[in-house]
């Protein structure tokens, strides 16, 4: 141990540990200034008082943070726009879909697949379509939506025996989701008009 008057001095050959396990050896041959303080001690104090530099805009840390963006497929348009209020850029139509847009397009694809499904599918076609629906629920981009769909499929397995069975099964599944979201039911007797043949009034001709 050092004598009371010698606390803080490092003799030649003594070792001390720095953060990270690095070791540094202090030598006694440092020149002293007019007040008797070591130049090395003065330099250490000066460097300790220098504030740490914040990451610049072109630093890897800042660049990595700028790339992190919320999941558009997981939120609706209004929520997404609230996160973009500080941006001056105008909304473009060719941006990634938000949760509502993704849902609309996904249901359109599923209903159209059902509308053109074979009237009397083979056993292999029945199995393939049922498997497709289950795989769709596993890879759907909105995880909350996908989890909800998987739970519904466990309770209500896809009915792919015929085209009529499949279109009605999908329509009732869609209505279950609509009710959860507070949306009105769709008239399932009109699935062919909506997704294959067009409305009887000729408005789609």
Curated annotation (Swiss-Prot):
Which PROSITE patterns does the entry link to?
Answer: ERV_ALR
Region (Disordered) residue ranges read: 1-65
Please report the stretch or stretches of sequence annotated as the ERV/ALR sulfhydryl oxidase domain. 95-195
What is catalysed by this protein?
Answer: 2 R'C(R)SH + O2 = R'C(R)S-S(R)CR' + H2O2
Spell out which residues are annotated as carrying Phosphoserine: 59
Q: Which GO terms describe its molecular function?
A: flavin adenine dinucleotide binding; flavin-dependent sulfhydryl oxidase activity; growth factor activity; protein-disulfide reductase activity
- What is one Pfam family matched by this protein? Evr1_Alr
Biased composition range(s): Basic and acidic residues: 32-44
Its Enzyme Commission number(s) read: 1.8.3.2
Annotated residues that bind FAD are located at: 99-107, 111, 140, 171-183, 194-195
- Asked whether the UniProt record includes Cytoplasm among its keywords, one would answer yes
Going by the record, the broad EC class of this enzyme is oxidoreductase
Q: Which GO terms describe its biological process?
A: liver development; mitochondrial disulfide relay system
Intrachain disulfide bonds: 142-145, 171-188
Q: Name one GO cellular component term.
A: cytosol
Does Cytoplasm count among this protein's keywords?
Answer: yes
Q: In which tissues is it expressed?
A: Ubiquitously expressed. Highest expression in the testis and liver and low expression in the muscle.
Give the required cofactors.
Answer: FAD
Which keywords label this protein?
Answer: Cataract, Cytoplasm, Deafness, Disease variant, Disulfide bond, FAD, Flavoprotein, Growth factor, Mitochondrion, Oxidoreductase, Phosphoprotein, Primary mitochondrial disease, Secreted
* Listed Low complexity bias regions: 45-60
Oligomeric state and partners? Homodimer; disulfide-linked. May form heterodimers of isoform 1 and isoform 2. Interacts with CHCHD4/MIA40.
Q: Which disease is it linked to?
A: Myopathy, mitochondrial progressive, with congenital cataract, hearing loss and developmental delay: A disease characterized by progressive myopathy and partial combined respiratory-chain deficiency, congenital cataract, sensorineural hearing loss, and developmental delay.
Q: Protein name, please?
A: FAD-linked sulfhydryl oxidase ALR
Q: Which organism is it from?
A: Homo sapiens
What gene name does this entry carry?
GFER
């Amino acid at each position: 141990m050092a004598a009371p008057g010698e606390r803080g001095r490092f003799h030649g050959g003594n070792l001390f540990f720095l953060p990270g396990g690095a070791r540094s050896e202090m030598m006694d041959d440092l020149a002293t200034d007019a007040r008797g303080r070591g130049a090395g001690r003065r330099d250490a104090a000066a460097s300790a008082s220098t504030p740490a530099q914040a990451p610049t805009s072109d630093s890897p840390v800042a660049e990595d943070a700028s790339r992190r963006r919320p999941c558009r497929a997981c939120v609706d348009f209004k929520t997404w726009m609230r996160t973009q209020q500080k941006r001056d850029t105008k909304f473009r139509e060719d941006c990634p879909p938000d949760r509502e847009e993704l849902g609309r397009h996904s249901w359109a694809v599923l209903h159209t697949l059902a509308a053109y499904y074979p009237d009397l599918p083979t056993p292999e076609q029945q199995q393939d379509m049922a498997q497709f629906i289950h795989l769709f629920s596993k890879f759907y981009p909105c995880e909350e939506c996908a989890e909800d769909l998987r739970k519904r499929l466990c309770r209500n397995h896809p009915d792919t025996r015929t085209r009529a069975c499949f279109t009605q099964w999908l329509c009732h599944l869609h209505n279950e989701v609509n009710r959860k979201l507070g949306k009105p039911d769709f008239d399932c007797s009109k699935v062919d008009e909506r997704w294959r043949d067009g409305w009887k009034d000729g408005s789609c001709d």
